[in-house]
From Swiss-Prot:
Pfam families the UniProt entry points to: PapZ_C (PF22740), RapZ-like_N (PF03668)
Name of this chain's protein: Nucleotide-binding protein HI1146 homolog
Record key words, sorted: ATP-binding, GTP-binding, Nucleotide-binding
Entry superkingdom: Bacteria
UniProt-listed InterPro entries: RapZ-like, RapZ-like_N, RapZ_C
PANTHER family xrefs: RNASE ADAPTER PROTEIN RAPZ
Gene Ontology molecular-function annotations: ATP binding; GTP binding
Native source species: Aggregatibacter actinomycetemcomitans
Presence of keyword NAD: no
Lineage per the UniProt record: Bacteria, Pseudomonadati, Pseudomonadota, Gammaproteobacteria, Pasteurellales
Role played: Displays ATPase and GTPase activities.
Family the entry assigns: Belongs to the RapZ-like family.
Length: 110
C-alpha cells in the first residue's frame, strides 16, 4: 500500500488528516504568489509552470532539477527551492514501473 498521509493517526481519519493539513497550510496559501493545481500535471508540466513563474517566460534558460530525497536525511545542501511533492504519482507504486529507476525513460516520462 502507498504510504499514509503524514498527519494520519489512529485517532484521526484520512479525511480529517487532509482537512487538518489544509487548515495548517492556509496561512501559507493566503501569502502565496502562485498556486498551481497539479492534479492533471506531469512533472515536466510542473517544471514548465515553475520556470515560467520564476523567470517570467517559458524559455528554457532556467534549469530546474527535480531531485528526490528523504526529509529524515535532511534537505539537499545545494537546493535553492524545496517543494513537497508527495502528491505526485510515485512510480514505485506502479507495478510495471517498480523495477525501473528515474533514469529509465518509462519512469522519467510518467
Amino acid at each position: 500500500w502507498p504510504p499514509l498521509h503524514p498527519l494520519y493517526r489512529t485517532d484521526l481519519s484520512l479525511e480529517a488528516a487532509i482537512e487538518e493539513e489544509a487548515n495548517r497550510l492556509d496561512p501559507l496559501v493566503q501569502q502565496a504568489n502562485l498556486l498551481i493545481d497539479t492534479a492533471a500535471l506531469s512533472t515536466h508540466e510542473l517544471a514548465e509552470r515553475l520556470r515560467e513563474f520564476l523567470s517570467g517566460h517559458s524559455d528554457k534558460e532556467l534549469k530546474i532539477v527535480v531531485e528526490s530525497f528523504g526529509f529524515k536525511y535532511g534537505i539537499p545542501l545545494d537546493a535553492d527551492y524545496v517543494f513537497d511533492v508527495r502528491f505526485l504519482p510515485n512510480p514505485h507504486w506502479n507495478q510495471g514501473l517498480r523495477p525501473l529507476t528515474g533514469l529509465d525513460d518509462e519512469v522519467a516520462n510518467s
